[in-house]
């Protein structure tokens, strides 16, 4: 086991090394040279990478870092509650999305009142809504389908075969009920965000406060001592506790730093390549850039599912959706206000209001699918088809491939209505399951609060 584990770690690190060399030669060494007071010039070969070369190098770094990140999270489950380890993984995996959105929010504040500032505010919202819809439309739906149809799915205890066409389901861990309820609260609030003229301090207080409450609850959860790992996590979990914790921290820090530095040039490289073949820049920023920034998360989830840990994979996706739907939205107004030099609402136009409503409506429908702690092939396909059809229809309108009697904004509102109607029907038909879910979550929160300052114990304790 030791040789195979070290070989896997070495292979993952090797994928990241080209980008480490580029960053070291073009950013780190020049900074050190300037600090030390002498001149340094990066090699021309590394300083002038072509767009395609940049995409390849950064893409490999993202791939390798995603594996390191997944191993760190799985190893950490020996010492902290699984939900908390996955929450850390989720935040680190989507850190680049925060960075890209923060950049647009900063520009919106720095250039407030100008066309550039107005556009930046709209781009911040477009990037955020694109990322959130990708996470459900491709992430939740795609992983459910991959879990059921992948080779060896019969050995996955989460996959349940049922009679009927496309009736097989992925059964989810009931422990994710907490995340589902918190996500529902954030979703209901999100419907109200556009009504205030933009993202304001009340949005920040509620959404960030909601996520802080969630973290407070899961931190008081119990460590699961019987988690059966194989491969790299099993090897690392055999380390003595101090060495194990140090290794986890190192893996989280290294992979998180590489993902943070690599995804932005990876996304921009994809944008440039897309624009070169005629794809509009706004469309690229809303869809291609977020897809690139979500790539580490999706890679981690596919890795977990491939190990027959589909429940952990879904937990990671739901945790990512929760932190992006709370922390990401809530912190945009903070960044905008810092750039502005005073408190200010992050404003956006009506089309972006429609984007937020559509994103909230999609989330509402997706949550309705999960309240029985399972998702079928039919339901996953419905999520995927609704998502893809809206994106392709909007793209066709932008490119004037089709002519419709409605605008792109009207399409957003129509799809929002479809999601809300479908979600409402499901909530009504599954009201008993929803009631049980709420009661279970209330009990979980009550138990966590009643433990006071008690901390979870390591599996070694």
Stretches with model-predicted labels:
Residues 1-461:
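Hydrophobic alpha-helical segments, chiefly the membrane-spanning helices
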């Amino acid at each position: 086991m030791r040789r195979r584990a070290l070989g896997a770690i070495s292979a993952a690190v090797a994928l990241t090394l080209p980008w480490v060399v580029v960053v070291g030669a073009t950013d780190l060494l020049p900074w050190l040279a300037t600090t030390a007071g002498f001149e340094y010039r990066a090699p021309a070969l590394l300083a002038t990478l072509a767009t395609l070369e940049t995409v390849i190098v950064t893409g490999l770094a993202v791939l390798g870092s995603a594996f390191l990140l997944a191993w760190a999270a799985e190893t950490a489950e020996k010492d902290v509650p699984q939900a908390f380890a996955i929450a850390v993984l989720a935040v680190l995996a989507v850190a680049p999305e925060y960075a890209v959105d923060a950049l647009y929010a900063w520009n919106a504040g720095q250039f407030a009142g100008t066309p550039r500032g107005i556009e930046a505010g709209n781009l911040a919202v477009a990037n955020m809504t694109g990322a959130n819809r990708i996470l459900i439309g491709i992430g939740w739906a795609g992983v459910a389908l991959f879990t059921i149809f992948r080779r060896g799915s019969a050995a996955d205890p989460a996959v349940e075969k049922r009679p009927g066409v496309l009736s097989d389901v992925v059964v989810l861990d009931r422990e994710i009920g907490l995340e589902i309820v918190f996500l529902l609260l954030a979703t209901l609030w999100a419907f109200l965000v556009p009504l205030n003229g933009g993202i304001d301090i009340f949005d920040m207080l509620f959404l960030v406060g909601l996520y802080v409450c969630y973290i407070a609850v899961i931190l008081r959860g119990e460590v699961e001592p019987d988690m059966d790992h194989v491969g790299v996590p099993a090897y690392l979990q055999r380390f003595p506790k101090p060495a194990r914790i140090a290794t986890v921290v190192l893996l989280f820090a290294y992979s998180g730093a590489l993902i943070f530095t690599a995804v932005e040039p990876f996304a921009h490289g994809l944008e440039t390549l897309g624009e070169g073949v005629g794809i509009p820049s706004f469309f690229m920023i809303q869809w291609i850039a977020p897809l690139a920034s979500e790539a580490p998360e999706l890679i981690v989830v596919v890795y977990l599912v491939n190990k027959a840990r589909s429940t952990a994979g879904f937990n990671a996706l739901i945790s990512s959706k929760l932190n992006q739907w709370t922390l990401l939205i809530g912190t945009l107004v903070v960044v905008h206000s810092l750039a502005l030099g005073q408190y200010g609402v992050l404003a956006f136009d009506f089309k972006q209001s429609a984007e937020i409503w559509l994103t909230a409506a999609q989330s509402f429908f997706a949550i309705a699918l999960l309240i029985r702690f399972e998702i079928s092939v039919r339901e996953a396909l419905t999520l995927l088809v609704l998502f893809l059809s809206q994106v392709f229809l909007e793209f066709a309108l932008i490119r004037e491939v089709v002519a419709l009697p409605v605008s792109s904004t009207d399409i957003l509102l129509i799809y929002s209505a479809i999601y809300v109607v479908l979600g409402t029907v499901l909530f009504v038909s599954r009201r008993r399951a929803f009631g049980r879910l709420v009661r279970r979550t209330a009990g979980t929160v009550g138990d966590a609060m009643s433990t006071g300052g008690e901390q979870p114990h390591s599996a070694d304790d």
